[in-house]
Amino acid sequence: MSKLQLSIAVGNYDRMRPLIDGDVQIDGVDPVFMLQDPEEIFFRAFRTADYDICELSLSSYSVKTAAGTSPYIAVPVFPSRAFRHSSVYVRADRGINSPADLKGKRIGVPEYQLTANVWVRMFLEEEYGVKASDIQWVRGGYEDPTRIEKISLKLPEGVSLVNAPEGRTISNLLADGEIDGVIGPRAPSCFDRGHPQVKYLFEDPQKAAAEWYERRKLFPIMHTLGVRKTLAEQHPWLPGALVKAFEHSKAVALTRLSDTSATKVTLPFIEDQLRNARRLMGQDFWSYGFAENAHVVDRFLARDHAEGLSSRRLQPAELFHPASLESFKI
C-alpha cells in the first residue's frame, strides 16, 4: 500500500527539524513540508483550508470549533508555547510603571483574538486587576497597514476596539506616541530599532513569567496541530500516527539541545537556560499529550469564552480527535 502524500505546514522549529529532515518518519505518510511563518499558515488555513495538516492558532481554532466551522480537528501536539510577559511594550513617557497603569490607555494589537493576547489579558486581569474593558484597544498591522482580523468578532459590551487610521501601522503609532503601548507575539520594529521611548512593561519579563508559573503552573500554549477533518475520517489511524511522530521529533530535538559539549544553538549560556527551565518546570517542560496539558487548555478555553471570542464554553477534549487523547505505553 502506498503512503499518503500530505501537505504539512509548520514553522521551522528545532522540534520539527527531525521530521523535516527525514530523521523521523510519520507512519503511513509521505509528507510534503511547507515551512512558513505562522501568520501565513493561519490566514490560509482559516480562510481557504489550504493544507492537509498544519499548525493552528489555539485561539482562532477554538473560535472556529465553538462555531462549528473549523475544517480541522486538532491533535495534542503544541508546536509553539511561550510565556508572554515579554509581549507587552509601552511608551516610557506615559507614566506606565506597572500593569495597573494600563487602565485608560490606548493599546495597539495586530489582532484582538490572537492567542498571545488572550493569555496576556488573562494575567493582566487575574494578577493585576486590569480588565479588557479598562483599555482602549487599537487594531492594525504591526508593519503592514492592510493586515485584517482573520476571524469576525463580537466583543462584550464595554470593550472598545477601533481600527488604526488608514495607512498607519501599530509600530508607527507607537513610535509617534499616538498609542501608549502594544501587546502582541512579535516585538514592534520600533522596539527592535532601539526607540528611546519604547520599553518592556515588565522590567525583567523572564523573572515575571517564572514567578507567574510558580503561582499558576501554566506554560501557555500558542499553537496546536490540526488535520483536515475529512482526512481523519477517511484514515482514522492518522491522528495517532501524527502524535507519535511529532512526539518523537521533539524528543530528538531535546536530546540534541541537551548535548552541550558542542552546543547546537547559536546562543551562549544555553546550557544554563536549559538547566533553569528544567529546575522550574520539570524535565518534560515542553510536553505534548492531552492529559499533561488539559489544565492549560481548560484555562485558556475559559478565558476565550469569557472574552466573548468563543461562542460557547468548550471543554478541552472537544478540541482534539478522540483517537489522539491517549497514546500507547511500553
UniProtKB/Swiss-Prot annotation:
Hey, which pathway is this one from?
Answer: Xenobiotic degradation; phthalate degradation; 3,4-dihydroxybenzoate from phthalate: step 3/3
- Keywords for the protein's UniProt record, in alphabetical order: Aromatic hydrocarbons catabolism, Decarboxylase, Lyase
- Per the record, what are the reactions this protein catalyses? 4,5-dihydroxyphthalate + H(+) = 3,4-dihydroxybenzoate + CO2
Which SUPFAM superfamilies does the protein's record reference? Periplasmic binding protein-like II
Q: Which GO terms describe its biological process?
A: phthalate catabolic process
The UniProt record lists the EC number as 4.1.1.55
Q: Does the keyword Lyase apply?
A: yes
| Listed GO MF terms | 4,5-dihydroxyphthalate decarboxylase activity
Q: What class of enzyme is it?
A: lyase
Q: Which family does it belong to?
A: To P.putida DHP decarboxylase.
Q: What is this protein called?
A: 4,5-dihydroxyphthalate decarboxylase
* Gene source species: Comamonas testosteroni
**Gene of this entry:** phtD
